[in-house]
A protein has these predicted regions:
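Double-stranded RNA-binding/processing signature
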Residues: 1-195
Length: 195
């Protein structure tokens, strides 16, 4: 009787996750692998994450190529934002997957940002293998707020400075980062230019 309750609970839980993903897997092994951390099994999400990472880069790049008239530099900034670990964590959290990742007993504590990002990429890789590129594209369009790209702020100040200098001066650029005393994690950035 306990075993039947466990099976019912697991099937219910799987149904909830699939509903969140808005995708029905034909191959449930891919789905399970996409959620399985290496601390639990050798049959884990690492290879799916590798594939999903490439597909994510491609499909986000494709979206901006087709929908944004900005130059290559701006397109690169936009793509970098949406494929970043920080953005993948937002997608993971929005999908409420924290209780669905399968971890081994050796894993302690909260799920790290890196694992959250890896799981999103692994799910994308699994959807691609199971349903093809159009289904992977739909997953991205449903879960990544690509249409609001105009709200993305470019806060890569080092790149901005480099573009400004290279556009107006000729010379080599060098950077130096010096830790600040007494300020844990703080630093001073120095910029040098050879005229």
């Amino acid at each position: 009787m306990q075993y039947q309750k466990l099976i019912l609970f697991l099937n219910w839980r799987i149904g909830i996750v699939l509903k969140k993903l808005n995708y029905r897997f034909k191959n449930m092994d891919l789905f399970k692998r996409a959620l399985t951390h290496s601390s639990k099994s050798e049959n884990n999400y690492e290879r799916l994450e590798f594939l999903g990472d490439s597909i994510l880069d491609f499909l986000v790049g494709e979206y901006f190529y087709l929908n944004c008239n900005d130059d290559e530099g701006k397109l690169t900034i936009l793509r970098s934002h949406y494929v970043s670990e920080n953005y993948l964590v937002k997608v993971f959290d929005a999908l409420c997957l924290q209780d669905d990742v399968i971890l081994g007993k050796s894993y302690q504590g909260e799920i790290s940002k890196a694992i959250k990002g890896d799981v999103v990429e692994a799910i994308l890789g699994a959807i691609y293998l199971d349903g093809g590129l159009d289904k992977a594209r739909k997953f991205i369009y449903d879960n990544f707020d690509l249409k609001n790209y105009k709200n993305i702020i470019d806060d890569n100040y080092k790149s901005k400075l480099q573009e400004l200098i290279q556009g107006n001066f000729k010379g080599k650029i060098a950077y130096e980062t010096v830790p600040c005393e007494g300020n844990q994690g703080g630093f001073e950035a120095n910029f040098y230019m050879d005229e």
